[in-house]
Amino acid sequence: MTIGPIENISGIPLGILGTHLGFLEALVPDDNGMLPRNTDGEFVIAAGARELIELSPVKIDLIQISSFGTTNPDEKDALIAAVRDLGLEPQLVMMVGGVNPMNPDDEDEALAQLMVNLGAALRNNIAQVNSTSVETWMEGTPPSSEEEFEARVAQNIKLHLRAYEEAGLAGSCIDNWNIEFLRPGEFQNFTSLAKLRPILTGLNEKIGSPFFKALIDAAHCGDSGLSISENEVIV
C-alpha cells in the first residue's frame, strides 16, 4: 500500500539526525580530513538523507550534522551544499575531540576546533549551530567538589565567550548557539539541564542577549535524574 503525502500542520519543522545514518561510517573524517563517501562517491550522509526523504510521506525540513574541527573545510562546504540540494536546512553539531574544554591548558586547542566549525557556519550562512563542546564525550571525570565544578563552569564560559567574540558572532547569520548536555556516562559533569544552565546564564549575562541556549534531548532529560516537572521549571 502506498501512503500519500501527509501535511505537517504542527508549525514545527521535522528534522533528522545524521548520527542515525551512522557515526563512524558517515560523520567522522579520516586522517586526511575527508568525510565518508559511498561506492558512488556520494557523501554517506547525503545519500542516506535522500533515501529518507523519498521514504517519508511527511516533508523533512532539516538535518543535524555532527561536525569535527579536523574535517577539511572544503569537505564541510561540499557536504552542506549537498544536503541543501536535497532541500534540507543543515544544522551543525560542533564536536571537540582530543582536548578537555574544562581544562585551561587545553583552551587554545579547544577554541581552534570550535573556530573551524564556526567558520564553516559563517561561510555557509547557517542560522543555528549546536555543540556538545562543554565536555569531552565519554572521557570526562566527575568533579571532586562543588568548587571544582564551579571552576569547570567558569572555564567553559571563558572558552565559549572567546569563540563568540573571536568568530565575530554578534550580528552574524548565526541566530543561536545551542549547547547540549548528555546523559551520565556520556558526560560526567554536565548531565542535566540544571548543571548546564550556569554556563548558559553566565555567557548570556556577559554578551547581554540570550544567544546561548540549551539543546534539549527528551531522552537525556529522562536520564538526568530530574523529574518532568523539575525539567519544565528549568526550561
Each language-model region and where it sits:
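N-terminal pre-domain/capping segments
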Residues: 1-120, 205-212
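Acidic/histidine-rich catalytic cores of soluble enzymes
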Residues: 7, 29, 62-63, 164-235
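Active-site-proximal loop/turn and secondary-structure-junction residues that shape catalytic pockets
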Residues: 20-23, 67-69, 96-99, 133-137, ...
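Short, flexible/disordered intra-domain loops and linkers
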Residues: 23-42, 101-106, 137-148, 186-191, ...
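Charged helix-capping and loop-helix junction motifs
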Residues: 77, 107-114, 146, 150, ...
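Alpha-helix-loop-beta-strand connector modules within alpha/beta enzyme cores
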Residues: 80-98, 151-168, 197-206
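An active-site-proximal structural segment forming one wall of the substrate-binding cleft
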Residues: 104-127, 145-171
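Active-site groove signature of glycoside hydrolases
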Residues: 120-145, 169-185
